[in-house]
Amino acid sequence: MGSRLHVQEIQGGPPLPYEDDIRAFCKEYAELLDAHDPLRRFRDEFIVPSKKDLKRKTLFPNDETEETSDEECIYLCGNSLGLQPRSTRKYIEYYLRTWATKGVTGHFVPHDDQLLPPFVNVDEAGAKLMAPIVGALKSEVAVMGTLTANLHLLMASFYRPTRERYKIIIEGKAFPSDHYAVESQIRHHNLDPKDAMVLIESDDLDRPILDTEYILRVIDENAHSTALILLSAIQFYTGQYFDIQRITAHAQSKGILVGWDCAHAAGNVDLRLHDWNVDFAAWCTYKYLNAGPGGMAALFVHERHGRVDMEQAASGKEAFHPRFSGWWGGDKQTRFLMNNHFVPQQGAAGFQLSNPSVLDMNAVVASLELFNQTSMAEIRKKSLNLTGYLEHLLLRDPQTESSEKRPFSIITPSNPAERGAQLSIRLQPGLLDRVLESLDEDAVIIDERKPDVIRVAPAPLYNTYVEVWRFAQLFHLACDKALRGRE
């Protein structure tokens, strides 16, 4: 196949340039898509584990793995843990050098060659870079804490049950930590989750998707008794991308506050948290945002909830939205006066508790700097193409195009507007372990959700069309091998 093949610029998803082209199943086609990818340079900004790295039982090279290939693995697991940016090491080394050579003065003294401002201001640097990724004002974002801890802090502020309004609505198959957090918040207020926790459940096990109309119906049925809604922007299991704007507006019209867990959405889809009038949100940074395992999380508080009346606060009156408070959330002009009179910073920064880990912040910023070299609109555009190509290769393969021949189905919505990068693939019963074993032998990194689902998520900053093509070939072979082994 020559370069005469025309590759369109995709706007908003299908129809894709490969939709009716049998050549889409050739490696050369994927190579051409990569050649036309405006984000292809970012691949080199990340460290991709090699087959040798994965097989080696030590962190550093030894003689046992010399015969293993240096070829890079196929890493399609950015929805679980993003790859390490090459710049992360440099940022952390600069932090360690500052600490080693400046000690406590590193909190306040700037340097000509610094990558981040002095320790006392690193949180501002993180918020500035994070805000455009989630469609927020800088003042609406704080990079702090961890995801579940931040959800607890936000619910402590926004879940204020009354005799009439006391329920929290959450999806029935929410990530367990979210479920635990909501349940414990309800118990903390001496309420019974059986009465105060509304679970939105799908009644179709073969299609565990929550249609927007159904969600709105559940809201209507519980409107007069609901205080808060907490939903996932993208559902971790199915990969469904909820209609944040519509659900938020509908719930708020009923007097309900709305929060979103954006763990699988931040760095994945083009969020507009401010414009969509979201009350609050929280997310981690170790998935699509590539800040490392357990990396520092972030939260969003809409500006209308973050305002502080400084005159009222100075007189000791309640002048801000209730929250759990800590010294790092205090006004910078008075933070070090130690006078025990708390006046919060304006915006989300006023929800901070302790000084942030500068070590963790460096890992966050190293990745965010890459995101800020492009835009979420461009990242989302490639993601629509990349995941659409993956879906096409899985479902339209000439060998298994008939659904009756396929030993799997895709439970993620087929509408690209209703999903992010991830496709959740449900295998026929009894195939999962065999398929995973084959993929592992071929150094393919994805993740599983028992009993029968694998999640595959091409990350547009570092994954390529050729990788997606290679995965599809290996996945079909793994399925064939698993079927033969079951006979």
Swiss-Prot record:
Pyridoxal 5'-phosphate binds at L147, T148, F175, P176, S177, D178, S232, D261, H264, Y286, W327, N355. It is an enzyme of class 3 (hydrolase). The keyword Cytoplasm applies. This is Kynureninase 1. It comes from the Eukaryota. The modification N6-(pyridoxal phosphate)lysine is found at K287. It comes from Neosartorya fischeri (strain ATCC 1020 / DSM 3700 / CBS 544.65 / FGSC A1164 / JCM 1740 / NRRL 181 / WB 181). Pfam families: KYNU_C. Belongs to the kynureninase family. The gene is bna5-1. Pathway: Amino-acid degradation; L-kynurenine degradation; L-alanine and anthranilate from L-kynurenine: step 1/1; Cofactor biosynthesis; NAD(+) biosynthesis; quinolinate from L-kynurenine: step 2/3. The lineage of its organism: Eukaryota, Fungi, Dikarya, Ascomycota, Pezizomycotina. It catalyses: L-kynurenine + H2O = anthranilate + L-alanine + H(+); 3-hydroxy-L-kynurenine + H2O = 3-hydroxyanthranilate + L-alanine + H(+). GO terms for cellular component: cytoplasm. PANTHER family: KYNURENINASE.
